[in-house]
């Protein structure tokens, strides 16, 4: 694509813009050096406009540029719309009413259309600025491509260096593994080379002298009087099925509190007294004849309902008798 020539209007326009910038930012001020340097880099020149585009550059620009159209530039109707919206004339109005208001604004010269010559000049300025911007973009893309090519060319050397480093690391790992295996083998050899324990070293263990000392130690702890249990406290006298010793009755009476009545003397709740109340395991209980029940009491076919329901009675002579004819009277004085 061939370049364009700069028109007189554009040359004058660029000269006026340069004067305005230099008048605002003096060269004598050191703080304005950066601004003036940027102005020189972005200023549009005749060489920029005369530079033609190649086919590759045009294709790249078309693929990487998003086209935008500004419909508000040099449009008198846009200016009329801003004025009407500021006054609130278009609130809840139809499109037909809005178009009639635009025509009325132009007819009454509220806004005037821009001249065609003015619009053409402004379009020329915008085209020059766009070409300057496209040239800057192409130069920037070209520099990036050059950097990428140089990086790809230097990448084989870097890859060789990286492979060399990886090889060195793998060699170090293999050497460490070999050293660990050798140390493990040496440890196993040392363990196998240790002298075994002979039968002569184990002599004296389990002899008669050791057994004699162990038996003496056990006898000392077993025959300790502090831990010994008196046989009299464990031994219990047998109980007759028809009679009971007063010692057991007294011990049962002592366990009862003042509020609890003597159920055994009055012959009530006899079954609850004879029922075992211990929650311990059978192996932990002591076999005491005084606390054991006769099998005849447990068997249901030999229990007399009258003897269980009716309790004993005491007469004036102090003799305990049962209403059941089969039971024998109990002499309280002889028991005491």
Swiss-Prot record:
- Principal location listed in the UniProt entry: nucleus
Taking the record's annotation, the residue ranges forming a coiled coil are none
A GO CC annotation given for this chain: telomere cap complex
Comp. bias regions, Polar residues = 308-327
Q: Does the keyword Metal-binding apply?
A: no
Query: What's the impact of mutating residue 245 to P?
Result: In strain: Mexico 12
Q: Name one GO molecular function term.
A: telomeric DNA binding
* Other remarks in the entry: Multiple telomeric associations (TAs) in the same metaphase spread often result in multicentric linear chromosomes that resemble little 'trains' of chromosomes, hence the name 'caravaggio', an Italian train.
Name the reported effect of residue 112 to L.
Answer: In strain: North Carolina 29
What protein name is recorded for this chain?
Answer: Telomere-binding protein cav
Description of how the protein assembles with itself and partners: Interacts (via C-terminus) with Su(var)205 dimer (via hinge and chromoshadow domain) and with moi to form the terminin, telomere-capping, complex. Interacts with HP6, which is also part of the terminin complex.
Q: What is the effect of changing residue 212 to Q?
A: In strain: Colombia 32, Mexico 12, North Carolina 19, Zimbabwe 4 and Zimbabwe 70
Location of the motif Su(var)205-binding Pro-containing repeat 2:
289-295
Q: What is the effect of changing residue 146 to N?
A: In strain: Colombia 32
Q: Where in the cell is it found?
A: Nucleus; Chromosome, Telomere
Q: What is the effect of changing residue 192 to I?
A: In strain: Zimbabwe 4
């Amino acid at each position: 694509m061939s370049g364009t020539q700069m028109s007189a209007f554009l040359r004058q326009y660029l000269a006026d813009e340069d004067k305005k910038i230099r008048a605002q930012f003096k060269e004598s001020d050191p703080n304005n050096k950066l601004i003036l340097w940027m102005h020189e880099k972005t200023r549009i020149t005749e060489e920029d406009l005369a530079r033609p585009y190649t086919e590759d550059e045009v294709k790249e620009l078309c693929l990487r540029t998003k086209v935008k159209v500004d419909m508000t530039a040099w449009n008198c109707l846009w200016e009329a719309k801003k004025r009407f919206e500021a006054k609130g004339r278009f609130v809840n109005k139809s499109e037909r009413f809005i178009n009639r208001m635009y025509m009325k604004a132009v007819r009454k010269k509220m806004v005037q259309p821009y001249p065609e010559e003015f619009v053409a000049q402004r379009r020329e300025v915008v085209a020059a600025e766009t070409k300057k911007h496209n040239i800057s973009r192409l130069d920037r893309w070209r520099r990036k491509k050059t950097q990428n090519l140089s990086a790809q060319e230097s990448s084989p050397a870097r890859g060789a260096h990286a492979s060399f480093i990886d090889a060195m690391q793998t060699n170090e790992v293999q050497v460490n593994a070999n050293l660990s295996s050798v140390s493990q083998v040496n440890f196993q050899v040392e363990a196998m080379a240790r002298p075994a324990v002979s039968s002569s070293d184990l002599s004296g263990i389990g002899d008669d002298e050791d057994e004699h000392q162990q038996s003496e130690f056990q006898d000392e702890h077993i025959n300790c009087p502090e831990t010994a249990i008196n046989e009299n406290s464990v031994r219990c006298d047998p109980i007759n099925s028809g009679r009971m010793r007063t010692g057991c009755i007294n011990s049962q009476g002592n366990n009862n509190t003042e509020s609890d009545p003597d159920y055994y003397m009055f012959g009530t709740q006899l079954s609850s007294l004879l029922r075992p109340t211990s929650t311990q395991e059978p192996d932990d209980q002591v076999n005491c004849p005084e606390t054991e029940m006769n099998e005849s009491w447990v068997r249901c076919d030999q229990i007399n309902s009258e003897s269980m329901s009716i309790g004993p009675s005491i007469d004036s002579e102090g003799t305990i008798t049962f209403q059941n004819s089969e039971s024998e009277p109990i002499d309280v004085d002889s028991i005491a």
